[in-house]
Regions:
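Detector for methionine-enriched segments
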Residues: 1, 29, 128-131, 188, ...
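Long, compositionally biased low-complexity segments enriched in polar/charged residues
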Residues: 3-24, 116, 127, 146-185, ...
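Extended non-catalytic scaffold regions that mediate assembly and binding
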Residues: 25-35, 39, 109-112, 140, ...
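Surface-exposed beta-strand edges and their flanking turn/coil or helix-capping segments
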Residues: 75-77, 228-231, 237-240
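Cysteine-cluster motifs in flexible loop/terminal segments that predominantly coordinate metals
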Residues: 191-234
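N-terminal cysteine/histidine-rich coordination modules
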Residues: 217-218, 238-243
Length: 243
């Protein structure tokens, strides 16, 4: 699974100038999970991460490369939850190392979507997440009570890692939080769009998208993402053999 590798490199380049706090993941360090969404009223909130008017990005990238993702860990670029005193820019980026999934395109697509949906099943207490998949944004309202009780990106990140690793295809997970000003959140949002385009292209390939590049509406994605064109023609060849 190398389709997202170039996007991982682009992400790491954007983060290169920062000095993150790093926490290795260990089972048991997760924040309290309520098992369902919690409504945090504005009057009970300390602030919002990625609030309207602030930079925000959210995406998940996959790889089978141990060089790109080599351990379960949480990274934080910027102040932690108890150090924030007002609305701030925010990004949550997840890098997942998965097993080799290149044998069956349809199976690969289903596995990736199942893994990605894990993010919708994490319900940290006092940490109300609102996602906008169309805009690739994530906005979080954090309660004052959660901060008093010790909520942190270390424990929130651990909750996400636990959720992702319930899937046996996930070998290692890195969860990255950004709250510092000065990062190019617009560029991160653009990477999120490209990641979504890769997944959407997989869908179209499975639906029998034309292998004539001159008329294909997704030519730009295949040209930019290494391995996509080979995957596309490989599926087309399999379909031709079946016929």
């Amino acid at each position: 699974m190398e389709l997202f590798n170039s996007l991982i490199h682009d992400t790491l380049d954007l983060l290169d100038a920062g000095r993150p706090k790093v926490w290795p993941y260990r089972p048991g360090m997760e924040w309290t999970d309520l098992g369902q969404s919690e409504l945090v009223l504005q009057k009970d909130a300390a602030y919002e991460l990625g609030a309207s008017g602030k930079g925000s990005a959210n995406y998940v990238l996959f790889t089978s490369s141990a060089e790109l993702v080599n351990q379960d860990q949480i990274l934080l670029y910027g102040p932690d939850l108890d150090e924030i005193h007002g609305d701030v820019d925010f990004a949550r980026i997840v890098l997942l190392r998965v097993g080799v999934l290149d044998d069956d395109t349809e199976k690969v697509y289903r596995i990736l979507k199942d893994i990605e949906f894990a993010k919708y099943h994490v319900y940290p207490e006092g940490y109300m997440v609102r996602m906008s998949p169309e805009n690739h944004r994530e906005q979080v309202r954090v309660s004052r009570q959660a901060i008093r009780r010790g909520a942190s990106f270390r424990s929130i990140g651990a909750s996400y890692i636990k959720a992702y690793k319930k899937d046996p295809n996930v070998l290692q997970a890195t969860v990255i939080f950004l709250t510092a000003p000065g990062f190019d959140y617009a560029a991160m949002k653009n990477i999120a769009k490209k990641s979504s385009a890769v997944t959407n292209t997989l869908t179209h390939i499975l639906e029998g998208l034309s292998t004539d590049c001159s008329i294909c509406s997704l030519k730009d994605v295949c040209d930019e993402i290494e391995g996509m064109k080979e995957l596309h023609f490989g599926v087309g060849a399999k379909g031709a053999k079946k016929d």
